Amino acid sequence: MRSFHDCLPRDGAAKIISLISHITLLNEEKEPNALSLIKDAAFAIIAGDCMGAYKLYHDCARRLLLSPARRVSGDMFMDHLIWLAVEREHAFAKSSARGELDEALLMSFRSDLAALGELASLDWHDIYRMCAERYRELQAKSRYARDDISVMSSAAWTGTEPRPKPQQKDVPLPGDAAAPLPPPSESEWLSWSYGEKEPRGEYAADEVLEEIYIRLMESPDWRGMAEDLFNLFASSGSGIFLKTRLLKCAGGTLGLAAARHEAVALSVQDNAKQALGERIIAFMRGSRPLPVLIHGPKAIGKTELALSMADEFPELRAVIIEPMAGADVHRLFARLCAQPLRFMLLIENADAYSPLWSPLLCACTGGGLPDNVLPVATGTSASGMEEFVVKIAMDKLELDGFVNTVKELVEAQAPYLQADMGWIRNASVDYQLDAHDELNIPAAKLIAQRYMAEHE
C-alpha cells in the first residue's frame, strides 16, 4: 500500500478510519480515546471540515500527553501504540501471563498488531498535509464548478450526446459564510515528536522490553511480534508487573509504591538477612511458602531488610499491603496467582490482636494462600503470631553496634570521607543522653548526616 506520506487526502483519511475500526482486542474500551479522536479527525478531513479536524487532532494530542504510555520512541503517537500492545493489561496479556495460549485471542492479537503496525507509520505532519490538501481540493472544485453551457460545449466538441448534469448541492464559493475554513498553518499544529529514541525511566522487565521496543519501532509489520509478546507476558507478567518490583495494595487497589532509597547493607542485620535469604531462596526454588515474621524493636530496619532482600531476586516482586477486608484479600491473591512471578507480601507493623488485621493474617496462614505468594510480616512482638511459623528476631542496637552502623552509613553515602570513630562515638553518646531515645536506624542516619555535613 501507499504510505500515509504520499497518499491522497481522502484515501489517507479513509485508511486511518479503516485501520482504527479494525482494532478490537487492543483498543481502549472507554471513548473518546486517542485512536477514536484521530478517527474522528479523519472523518472531518473527508467532510472538508479542516478546523474540526484541527480541534480533534489537538484533543488527541492532549490524550497522548496524559497517556500512561512510557516515553520510548521520540513520538507520542508511536509510544501510545506500543503501550496498547505491550504495557496495557489486555485480554491476551492476561491469558499469556497465566501460561494459556488462547488461539482465538492470538488470532485477534495478530490482526490488531498488523493494524497498529500500519498506523505506526502515521505522523503528525501527515494529518496536517491531508487537511491542507483537502482544503485546496475543495477550493479548486468551487472555483471550477461546471455550468450547463460548459457541459453542452464539451459534448459538442467531442461529438457525444450531452449527459444530464447530476443533481448536487451548491458548493460554497470562496468568501461565502458557508465556505470551509482553511486549516491553521503548520507551525500551529502540536508536534507528536519530542526527542530521541530511548526508554525513559527504569522498568522491572527492561532486559526484555528494550529489544521488544527496538523491533516494534523498526518493523513495518508487527504481526511477527505476537509470539515474542506472548513469551514476554508468560515470563515477566503483564501490565503493572512489567513496570516495577515494588507495589502497594491499599483499599483493595494494587498500584505503584512510592520510590525508596536503596538500602545500605548493615552488619548488625547480617544474621536476620541470612535467615530471611534462606527462606526466600527456598521459596524461589518452588518450596511451599511458609509465613515469615520479623520482630524486634521499633525503627530497627525490619522493613528495609525485607525490601533489600526483594531487590536481590529479579523475578521477585514486593507488595506492601495494608489491612483490608477478606474479599479484597482474595481478589488480590487471585490477581497475583495469575502472574508468572513470585511475590513477597510485606505486612508492616502487623497486630494479631487488631480486628483490622484479622482477615489479612488469616488469609496468609490459611489454605487459600497461592503458591507464588510469601507473606512476610513485621512487628514489635511475636505474641499472637503463632501461625507465622518462621520467626526472625532482630535485637535492639547497643552502643558499639550503633557506632558501627553510623560508620557504615557514612562509608556508603560518602566513600571519599574517612570515618572518625571517636567523633561518631561521642556524638552517639550525646544523642543517647540528650534525646533519651533508643538507639535505632533513623538515629544512626541522623548522626551520619551530621557527620557528613560537618566533614565535607
Feature locations, PLM:
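AAA+ P-loop ATPase mechanoenzymes
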Residues: R2-S267, N271, S428, D434
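Pre-Walker A (pre-P-loop) alpha-helix and adjacent loop at the N terminus of AAA/AAA+ ATPase modules
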Residues: A258-V292
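AAA+/P-loop NTPase substrate/partner-engagement loops
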Residues: D270, E312-L341, Y353
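Walker A/P-loop nucleotide-binding motif
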Residues: G286-A306
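Conserved nucleotide-binding/hydrolysis micro-motifs of P-loop NTPases
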Residues: A325-A327, D351-Y353, T380-G384, K396-F402
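Conserved catalytic/switch belt of AAA+ P-loop NTPases
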Residues: F333-A338, L346, D351-G384
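C-terminal alpha-helical "lid" subdomain
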Residues: E386-E456
